[in-house]
């Protein structure tokens, strides 16, 4: 800031000999510390004292106007605490003002004599605004102080139109008035609304920070009262050394009749002296220059809201109430047991019923992070060994039965209502029961847990939901031909190993007959996993896991139960041959192949083989070709959503297999006799080699359909296409008749039945073509009908050779996979149920149940031939992948058929009536993407 000076006060200026009131403006970075003014060096001491008092009263009210940035300077003869006098020097460059403004400025600056005409407007600005208000002064003091006849400081009040109305009163005794009476006497007036004329806004001095001192010795002294407000004015000017825009505040002038009349009572939050409160500066911000005492000490009488303004900026904003979070956190850490997922109330609060709240509903900030992770902690859905299973773990021992849950997963035995809890939280299903714990005071002892685990199915499932890799004993499975065969129960953390066929039959004999050949293992009479939830969720990604159930023993000529090399869970990676670490993503693999498969599937890499897609993938060369390695992972049945299992233990596996196996007869020479022995093991059981539903599918299979093609005539494009259309019409009628006999199809709405047939008739026809070509000619030709068989030569001569090559891929896949008739029948039904409208079906629930039932039948059909967990899972992957690939293949047939139908007259091709109706009504919709294909695997 530019230092402004005034003339020496000792030089006589007028005829009366009165000293000139030329004040000296001090530098902006200086402030006085509230010390007593030293005696002026003028010859007229009483007049100087009176002038200083009046100037203090005028300066205390000057900042009260929000638009007034003029900070008056004190007199030029004032001395600082260090004893250095400030001699004022005139400023010749300041413009002169008119006499009336000069008189007003002189009156406001406590000029002891009449104003001179040659002084600038800044000469009448005392610097008393930089000192704290006196005991009797308030913030409501007027900016333009009138002069009483008894006070020779000023002869008349200001005439500035922006000034407030002034009252006649003496300003001399203001310094001696007691506290609390400021503004009741001669020193009261309204707030000034703007700066005086003649002073440009750019030349107005800026206020100082509340805690910044201009004097060297003032930093160590504590101010008795806060000085001027250290806030930013409306114009945007901030004090030097202040925290900046964080401490924004605008002192408001007193309004209303009281301010106009001169009475300005202190605000409720103001100090006793009338000074407005200064916001407390946050200690986390850079401290301004000044004493720490002034920075930290709030103004006397200030409300906490005003003094701790900055503290609210750093308070963390939580999504829930602090009381609720505190009670919730304490309850989660201290709860010992929980009942149905409800939470215990905080200490000292009455319990009340409420909707159970899951731990996942609360943000991470509500739970304290564990400083030291516990070795015995495990996830609520993790794998552990209940004591009732009687399977000793070689690696963990008894520790697996005594593990305690993580603190944030525990819950209390009661429910409660928190005051700060959101009222609209949805009621969530209860959490599964926790595992038995060995900690002092936690849960029941191991014996009680073991008794609960081995209890009957009438009791709660309890710890039976949490099981290790295999379970030795279980309840009989549900009866019926459509019983599910899950790999694991929802909530279970491991893959369940079922009994073999004979063992399943024997265990089910106590409860009743079961028509299924290989029944899955039951757990505490818990309902088996329905495929409606597991298969139809997210594009059916988890359907292959149930194949791990079909691990059956192979009998040979030995006295003890022996299992083939394929049936045992081996500790060899099925991808590269390295040592396997566990069952990852549904397949027994090593850690390297597990990580590779996860990264390859999540990253959606498009690997390309540099060879012929037959690279060797072993422990040494597994990194050479990622394309062949990924292909081998998919062929083995690895699924990205598969659950991970614990490390295999050979002793545990052998004991489990011995427990579930039944003694086999001695001296059986071949496999056929062993199979017959297993079937006739229990005469009371109605055990069949083929499930009844598959037998029913065989019985309703349509008869051979002829195309009526005349093979005596040479093939032409029109005659060949016309014969194929006639064959398609007959096959379409056959599909309608077959679907009416299909179990469960008539339960659907009639519109849904028509829609499914119209969407899938082409898929069913080409799938039947592939099956006939595979069975009758071993996939060497296209066997459309007994009277219409196209070899490769006839395909080349036809006009749709490329289309024939596309259809030829299906019998070649059948030959490669060696598809059985049972598998073909189940896959054919799934093709009928493989495409639905985008908006869904009218009877969507019945459709899902029907589809789930036939997926289970496909599982049973796979289990009739496959003898191991891995082979069954791999087989299911291959068959379902073939069903998914048919969508793209059939789309090419739809496009060719629609183009031929449109150009039928030009091509001289006849289309039957029913087939024409289906093509015209549905093919444009299918090709436009207005249907939803149901895929087993995500692309």
From Swiss-Prot:
Tissue expression summary? Expressed in mammary gland and uterus.
Give the UniProt subcellular location, in the record's own words: Nucleus; Cytoplasm
Where does this protein have compositionally biased stretches of type Basic and acidic residues? 1-11, 27-36
Which region ranges are annotated with the description Disordered? 1-302
The region called Mediates transcriptional transrepression (in isoform A) is annotated at 175-314
Alphabetically list the UniProt keywords.
Cytoplasm, DNA-binding, Isopeptide bond, Lipid-binding, Lipoprotein, Metal-binding, Nucleus, Palmitate, Phosphoprotein, Receptor, Steroid-binding, Transcription, Transcription regulation, Ubl conjugation, Zinc, Zinc-finger
> Which domain of life does the UniProt lineage start with?
Eukaryota
Which parts of the sequence are NR C4-type zinc fingers?
573-593, 609-633
List each copy of the NR LBD domain by range: 685-919
* Ranges where the record places region Modulating, Ala/Pro-rich: 1-572
Q: Which cysteines are joined by disulfide bonds?
A: none
After translation, how is this protein modified? Phosphorylated on multiple serine sites. Several of these sites are hormone-dependent. Phosphorylation on Ser-303 occurs preferentially on isoform B, is highly hormone-dependent and modulates ubiquitination and sumoylation on Lys-392. Phosphorylation on Ser-303 and Ser-349 also requires induction by hormone. Basal phosphorylation on Ser-200 and Ser-404 is increased in response to progesterone and can be phosphorylated in vitro by the CDK2-A1 complex. Increased levels of phosphorylation on Ser-404 also in the presence of EGF, heregulin, IGF, PMA and FBS.
Q: Which Gene3D superfamilies match?
A: Erythroid Transcription Factor GATA-1, subunit A (3.30.50.10), Retinoid X Receptor (1.10.565.10)
* Positions of short motif Nuclear localization signal: 193-197
Q: Which GO terms describe its cellular component?
A: cytoplasm; nucleus
Keyword RNA-binding belongs to the record: no
Is Oxidoreductase one of the keywords? no
Where is the segment annotated AF2? 693-939
Q: Which stretches of sequence are listed as region AF1? A: 463-552
Report biased composition (Low complexity) as residue ranges: 15-26, 49-67, 211-230, 257-278
What is annotated about its quaternary structure and interactions? Interacts with SMARD1 and UNC45A. Interacts with CUEDC2; the interaction promotes ubiquitination, decreases sumoylation, and represses transcriptional activity. Interacts with PIAS3; the interaction promotes sumoylation of PR in a hormone-dependent manner, inhibits DNA-binding, and alters nuclear export. Interacts with SP1; the interaction requires ligand-induced phosphorylation on Ser-349 by ERK1/2-MAPK. Interacts with PRMT2. Isoform A interacts with NCOR2. Isoform B (but not isoform A) interacts with NCOA2 and NCOA1. Isoform B (but not isoform A) interacts with KLF9. Interacts with GTF2B.
Homology family: Belongs to the nuclear hormone receptor family. NR3 subfamily.
> What role is this protein assigned?
The steroid hormones and their receptors are involved in the regulation of eukaryotic gene expression and affect cellular proliferation and differentiation in target tissues. Depending on the isoform, progesterone receptor functions as a transcriptional activator or repressor.
User: What does the entry note on its domains?
Assistant: Composed of three domains: a modulating N-terminal domain, a DNA-binding domain and a C-terminal ligand-binding domain.
Q: What's the protein name?
A: Progesterone receptor
Which species expresses this protein natively?
Canis lupus familiaris
């Amino acid at each position: 800031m530019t230092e402004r000076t005034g003339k020496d006060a000792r030089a006589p200026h007028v005829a009366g000999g009165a000293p000139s009131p030329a004040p000296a403006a001090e530098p902006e970075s200086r402030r006085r510390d509230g010390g007593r003014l030293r005696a002026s060096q003028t010859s007229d001491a009483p007049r100087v004292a009176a002038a200083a008092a009046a100037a203090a009263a005028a300066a205390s009210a000057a900042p009260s106007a929000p638009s007034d940035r003029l900070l008056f300077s004190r007199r030029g003869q004032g001395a600082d605490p260090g004893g250095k006098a400030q001699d004022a020097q005139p400023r010749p460059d300041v413009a002169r003002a008119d006499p009336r403004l000069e008189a007003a400025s002189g009156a406001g600056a406590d000029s002891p004599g009449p104003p001179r005409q040659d002084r600038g407007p800044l000469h009448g600005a005392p610097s008393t605004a930089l000192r704290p208000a006196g005991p009797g002064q308030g913030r409501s003091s007027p900016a333009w102080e009138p002069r009483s006849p008894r006070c020779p400081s000023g002869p008349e009040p200001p005439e500035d139109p922006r000034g407030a109305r002034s009252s006649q009163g003496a300003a001399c005794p203001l310094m001696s008035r007691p506290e609390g009476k400021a503004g009741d006497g001669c020193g009261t007036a309204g707030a000034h609304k703007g700066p005086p004329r003649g002073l440009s806004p750019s030349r107005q001095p800026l206020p100082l920070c509340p805690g910044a001192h201009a004097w060297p010795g003032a930093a160590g002294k504590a101010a008795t009262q806060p000085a001027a407000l250290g806030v930013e004015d409306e114009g945007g000017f901030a004090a030097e050394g202040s925290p900046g825009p964080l401490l924004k505040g605008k002192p408001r002038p007193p309004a209303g009749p009281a301010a106009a009349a001169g009475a300005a009572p202190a605000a409720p939050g103001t100090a006793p002296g009338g000074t407005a409160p200064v916001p407390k500066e946050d200690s986390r911000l850079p401290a301004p220059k000044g004493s720490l005492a002034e920075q930290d000490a709030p103004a006397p009488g200030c409300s906490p809201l005003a003094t701790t303004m900055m503290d609210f900026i750093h308070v963390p904003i939580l999504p829930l109430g602090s009381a609720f979070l505190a009670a919730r956190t304490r309850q989660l850490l201290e709860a010992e047991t929980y009942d149905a997922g409800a939470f215990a109330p905080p200490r000292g609060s009455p319990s009340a019923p409420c909707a159970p709240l899951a731990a996942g509903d609360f943000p991470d900030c509500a739970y304290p992070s564990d400083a030291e992770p516990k070795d015995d902690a495990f996830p609520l859905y993790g794998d552990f060994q209940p004591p009732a299973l009687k399977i000793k773990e070689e690696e963990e021992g008894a520790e697996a039965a005594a593990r305690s849950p993580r603190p944030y997963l525990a819950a209390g035995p009661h429910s409660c209502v928190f005051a700060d809890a959101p009222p609209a939280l949805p009621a969530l299903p209860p959490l599964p029961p926790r595992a038995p714990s060995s900690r002092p005071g936690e849960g029941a002892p191991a014996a009680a847990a073991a008794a609960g685990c081995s209890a009957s199915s009438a009791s709660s499932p309890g710890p039976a939901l949490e099981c290790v890799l295999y379970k030795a004993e279980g309840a009989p499975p549900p009866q019926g031909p459509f019983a599910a065969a899950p790999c694991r129960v929802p909530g279970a953390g491991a893959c369940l190993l079922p009994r073999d066929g004979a063992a399943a039959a024997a265990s089910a004999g106590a409860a009743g007959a079961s028509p299924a050949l290989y029944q899955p293992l039951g757990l505490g009479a818990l309902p088996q996993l329905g495929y409606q939830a597991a298969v139809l969720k997210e594009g059916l990604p988890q359907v292959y896991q149930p194949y791990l159930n079909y691990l059956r023993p192979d009998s040979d000529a030995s006295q003890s139960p022996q299992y083939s090399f394929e049936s045992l869970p081996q500790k060899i990676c099925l991808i590269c041959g390295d040592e396997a670490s566990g069952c990852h993503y549904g397949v027994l693999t090593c850690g390297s192949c597990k990580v590779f498969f996860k990264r390859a599937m999540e990253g959606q890499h498009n690997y390309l083989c540099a060879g012929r897609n037959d690279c060797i993938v072993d422990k040494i060369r597994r990194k050479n070709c990622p394309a062949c390695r990924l292909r081998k992972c998919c062929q083995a049945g690895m699924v990205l959503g598969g659950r991970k299992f614990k490390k295999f233990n050979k002793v545990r596996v052998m004991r489990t297999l011995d427990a579930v196996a039944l003694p086999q007869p001695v001296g059986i020479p071949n496999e056929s006799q062993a199979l017959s022995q297993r079937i006739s093991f229990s005469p009371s059981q109605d055990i069949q080699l083929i499930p009844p539903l598959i037998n029913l599918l065989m019985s309703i299979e349509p008869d051979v359909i002829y195309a009526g093609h005349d093979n005596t005539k040479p093939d032409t494009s029109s005659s060949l296409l016309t014969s194929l259309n006639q064959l398609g019409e007959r096959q379409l009628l056959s599909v309608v008749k077959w679907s009416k006999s299909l179990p469960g199809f008539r339960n659907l709405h009639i519109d849904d039945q028509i829609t499914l047939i119209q969407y899938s008739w082409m898929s069913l026809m080409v799938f039947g073509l592939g099956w006939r070509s595979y069975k009758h000619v071993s996939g060497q030709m296209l066997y459309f009908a007994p009277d219409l068989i196209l070899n490769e030569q006839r395909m080349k001569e036809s006009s749709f050779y490329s289309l024939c090559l596309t259809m030829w891929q299906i019998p070649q896949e059948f030959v490669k996979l060696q598809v059985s008739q049972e598998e073909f029948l189940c896959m054919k039904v799934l093709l009928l149920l493989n495409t639905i409208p985008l908006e869904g079906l009218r009877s969507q629930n019945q459709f899902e149940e029907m589809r789930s039932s036939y997926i289970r039948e496909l599982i049973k059909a796979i289990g009739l031939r496959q003898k191991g967990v891995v082979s069954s899972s791999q087989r299911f992957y291959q068959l379902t992948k073939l069903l998914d690939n048919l969508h793209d293949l059939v789309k090419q047939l739809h496009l060719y058929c629609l183009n031929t139908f449109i150009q039928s007259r030009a091509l001289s091709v006849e289309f039957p009536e029913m087939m024409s109706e289906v093509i015209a009504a549905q093919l444009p919709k299918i090709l436009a993407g207005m249907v939803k294909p149901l895929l087993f695997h995500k692309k």
